[in-house]
Amino acid sequence: MSAATDEILEKLKSLSLLEAAELVKQIEETFGVSAAAPVGGMMMAAPGAVPGAAAEPEEEKTEFDVILEEVPADKKIAILKVVRTITGLGLKEAKDLVESTPKPIKEGTNKDDAEETKKKLEEAGAKVTVK
């Protein structure tokens, strides 16, 4: 390895759990990726069609996407507040997300978190699906 990568690795080893979680969140936001996506099944499913078909349903049982389908105009502000709370997005980003439905609010989350997110959004008046 190069000196630069060795140095980065040593700095990563010294991070606390909280700092590591913040780093993951910043990387996800900066590069538009999800740390949950490269679990292995998705990338490995592409080369082999038959084994991939068997692996995908297993992942779908443990990882869920919460999709904001519809936002009634009279409920937009309440839904916007809930979206900001759930995602941690800024006002402009959350507004853009709410106005461009259907859009995923959370991806690759567990069942309990997906159901809780759906409940909060539906209480605010949004139409939501969990896939």
UniProtKB/Swiss-Prot annotation:
Keywords: Ribonucleoprotein, Ribosomal protein. Residues 99-131 are annotated as: Disordered. CDD domains: Ribosomal_L7_L12 (cd00387). Residues 99-125 have a biased composition (Basic and acidic residues). One of its GO terms (cellular component) is cytosolic large ribosomal subunit. GO terms for biological process: translation. InterPro entries: Ribosomal_bL12 (IPR000206), Ribosomal_bL12_C (IPR013823), Ribosomal_bL12_C/ClpS-like (IPR014719), Ribosomal_bL12_oligo (IPR008932), Ribosomal_bL12_oligo_N_sf (IPR036235). Gene3D superfamilies: 3.30.1390.10, Single helix bin. The keyword Ribosomal protein applies. The keyword Glycosyltransferase does not apply. One of its GO terms (molecular function) is structural constituent of ribosome. It comes from the Bacteria. Belongs to the bacterial ribosomal protein bL12 family. Homodimer. Part of the ribosomal stalk of the 50S ribosomal subunit. Forms a multimeric L10(L12)X complex, where L10 forms an elongated spine to which 2 to 4 L12 dimers bind in a sequential fashion. Binds GTP-bound translation factors. Forms part of the ribosomal stalk which helps the ribosome interact with GTP-bound translation factors. Is thus essential for accurate translation. NCBIfam families: L12. This is Large ribosomal subunit protein bL12. It comes from Gloeothece citriformis (strain PCC 7424) (Cyanothece sp. (strain PCC 7424)). The lineage of its organism: Bacteria, Bacillati, Cyanobacteriota, Cyanophyceae, Oscillatoriophycideae.
